[in-house]
Structures are given as structure tokens and as C-alpha cells.
């Protein structure tokens, strides 16, 4: 794919789109610095390129350059304030920075725009748990499960929340459902073993 975009750029270097899509290809290959260069060129050619700002923010985030990511998300929101994904992405960066209240607010904005974003429910559940809003976190997990009954992440996170409140039987039930969706999930296998241990059901470990 990168070679194809190289050829297009060689012939039509004045177009912003080939730089943007080559940036996406580099982002998928974990070449974050290369992606940033291409997104920056796309923005130079088209200063109102919303998606270039948003994905450059993602690349900055992956390089742990959170201030740069936040600046790009802010610019993207100024250009397109009704896009759910840019709020969800900014929430991820805010959570990494430890600003859980801001992250919760952005996940909520994303879900107001698009109420079917499973990842936003799960990410909001994580920050709500950190903000000691156990009931809110549980509600978000349940909303995610309603949208995707085969989400091992949703069942696994809800199982963890049950475990935190010593609701061991409910935790086991959710971990079992998570493992039914993905039997190879080692993290959930270990979590279930911890619950069995707490319940003194040692043979199950």
C-alpha cells in the first residue's frame, strides 16, 4: 500500500489525500514518526483536514507525547465538533495522563454522539472505577455487553468489578462467559483462578 501511495505522491505531490492514507498505512505498521510526517504534510496542503489532525493525535499518543496529541485533538474538535471518535481518542489520552474526570467527560460526549461505541463504554467504565463510581462502571460494562454479547473484554471487566466487591460467584459467571467468547484469554484465565483461590476452591485453580 505504501508503494502505491508513493507513486501517487510522485505524480501528484499537491494532493493531501495520498499523504494522509500513506500516514494511515504507516500508523498500522507502528511507524508513528513516519505517520506524523505524512499527516503534517497533508495538513500543510489542507489546513482543514480533520482526519489528519485526529490521526496525528493518535500517533503522538502512541509516542507518549500527550501534549502534542491533546493539541491535535483540540484542533480536530474545532473543525468537527460532532465526531464521536475524536472525543473517545482524547479520553484515552486524558486517562493516560491521569486526568480521569476529563476522560470520563470526553467518553460521555462520544457516547452522546454515538451510543453504540462499545470501546467508549468500556473505557469509561475503567475511569469510573478509578473515580470510585462502581455502579457507573458496572452500568457501562452492561451497556457494552448489550451491544456485543461476545465481548470477552466487557465480561472480563465486569467480572473484575464483581471481584473487587467480593461478589465472587458473579465474577466467576462473567469470567466464564468471557472465556466462552475467547478461551485463549490468559488474563481472564488468571483472574478466574484468583477468584477460585479467594473462594478456597483450590482444585479449580
Where are these regions (language model features)?
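Alpha-helical tetratricopeptide repeat
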Residues: 1-205
Amino acid at each position: 500500500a505504501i508503494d502505491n501511495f508513493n507513486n501517487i505522491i510522485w505524480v501528484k505531490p499537491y494532493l493531501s489525500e495520498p499523504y494522509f492514507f500513506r500516514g494511515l498505512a504507516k500508523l498500522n505498521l507502528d511507524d508513528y514518526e513516519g505517520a506524523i510526517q505524512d499527516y503534517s504534510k497533508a495538513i500543510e496542503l489542507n489546513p482543514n483536514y480533520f482526519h489528519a489532525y485526529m490521526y496525528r493525535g493518535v500517533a503522538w499518543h502512541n509516542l507518549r507525547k500527550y501534549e502534542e496529541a491533546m493539541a491535535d485533538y483540540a484542533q480536530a474538535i474545532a473543525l468537527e465538533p460532532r465526531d464521536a471518535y475524536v472525543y473517545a481518542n482524547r479520553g484515552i489520552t486524558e486517562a493516560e495522563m491521569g486526568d480521569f474526570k476529563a476522560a470520563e467527560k470526553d467518553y460521555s460526549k462520544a457516547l452522546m454522539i454515538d451510543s453504540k461505541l462499545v470501546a467508549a463504554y468500556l473505557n469509561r467504565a475503567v475511569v469510573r472505577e478509578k473515580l470510585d463510581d462502581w455502579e457507573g462502571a458496572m452500568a457501562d460494562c452492561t451497556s457494552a455487553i448489550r451491544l456485543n454479547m461476545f465481548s470477552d473484554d466487557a465480561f472480563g471487566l465486569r467480572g473484575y468489578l464483581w471481584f473487587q466487591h467480593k461478589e465472587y460467584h458473579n465474577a466467576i459467571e462473567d469470567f466464564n462467559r468471557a472465556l466462552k467468547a475467547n478461551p485463549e484469554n490468559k488474563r481472564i484465565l488468571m483472574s478466574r483462578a484468583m477468584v477460585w483461590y479467594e473462594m478456597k476452591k483450590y482444585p479449580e485453580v
